[in-house]
Swiss-Prot record:
Cofactor section: [4Fe-4S] cluster
Pathway where it operates: Amino-acid biosynthesis; L-leucine biosynthesis; L-leucine from 3-methyl-2-oxobutanoate: step 2/4
Stated role: Catalyzes the isomerization between 2-isopropylmalate and 3-isopropylmalate, via the formation of 2-isopropylmaleate.
Assigned keywords, A-Z: 4Fe-4S, Amino-acid biosynthesis, Branched-chain amino acid biosynthesis, Iron, Iron-sulfur, Leucine biosynthesis, Lyase, Metal-binding
Protein name from the UniProt record: 3-isopropylmalate dehydratase large subunit
Binding partners and assembly: Heterodimer of LeuC and LeuD.
Organism: Clostridium beijerinckii (strain ATCC 51743 / NCIMB 8052) (Clostridium acetobutylicum)
Amino acid sequence: MGMTMTQKILAAHAGLEAVKAGQLIEANLDLVLGNDITTPVAVNEFKKFGTDKVFSKSQIAIVPDHFTPNKDIKAAEQVKYIREFAQNMEIENFFEVGEMGIEHCLLPEKGLVVAGDVVIGADSHTCTYGALGAFSTGIGSTDMAAGMATGKCWFKVPSALKFVLKNKPAKWISGKDIILHIIGMIGVDGALYKSMEFVGDGLQYLSMDDRFTMANMAIEAGGKNGIFPVDDKTEEYLKDHASREWKVYEADEDAEYDKVFEIDLSELRPTVSFPHLPDNTRTIDNTGDVAIDQVVIGSCTNGRISDLRMARDILKGKKVKKGIRCIVIPGTQKIYLQAIKEGIVTDLVEAGAAFSTPTCGPCLGGHMGILAKGERCVSTTNRNFVGRMGHVESEVYLASPAVAAASALTGKITDPELV
């Protein structure tokens, strides 16, 4: 039996000719990632190894993004601690405020992840880089520490689910709608410890930003990783961004999949995930009359330039409904600058939105838009658990930038076609 794309990448990095689902392996790492929340714990564990150096100064990335710019004294102390560690270890890829971005937007932009890589990150949405044809997955701070010390990590080789995407997406359908549809279909544990492998002729219509969004939310279905084959769009992106050579892996024709799903993108409708799990989805036609208090457009899921363009296209020349808060957060400084050059920032601010420096901020209930008791938010983020963005009695509705922007105009969950 042949191997899936994920299995081929893992086999190569383990120095093996072949692997099979369930097999335990030790693989060489191309990149180890941490942020301001997870890295302090990893540093504490790293110090127990008794080594005075990391395995590679260039293959570790530390991105303070969750509580930055520092939201309080504790946040400042955490970043100071990991900044000093990075300086002492001469880690090349420590990204300070002013040069940083949300980690999963920043690393592809900097070319630090390329096709064929094996990447671990002490953040669950590290699976984002599967959009580039890499195997990337979230791990805990202890594994991050071991990775920084040894350049290796152990894995159980995952089995796979295959998603065959067919036809051109219907109007307003983005990567966010597709992945919410999939999660709603299979459930938050539907891909538990499996690779989610996306294929099909529908890929030609999906931008890299769409793919980043979809791979990002593989974890919300329980997936070990999400991954896309390398095609012309991937190659074009890598040529523009990659800092080193990449390698293309393709699934064998006789690769084994636990299940194959066919999805006709032309039949999808904008999709919203209701509280309090990402799989509690409804199409925009079945959302009912849900009044909201806040809209957030941004995050590692939807903070890229195409997302901001979509929000601008809907909000330009209009006004956010009185009493509604609309917060827009670009994924990186480069995206921020591009939004300035294109007039997006001006258009959004004139519409009544607040525009922020890059940060994870409200996504995890950190800062920059916390919800009070009883408040509702339409957000382009990736999780809507109880208390995720603030008070335990607040509610988060996950949606695309188009639905979020339309909802900001009306003060309720709204089909973008209607504004």
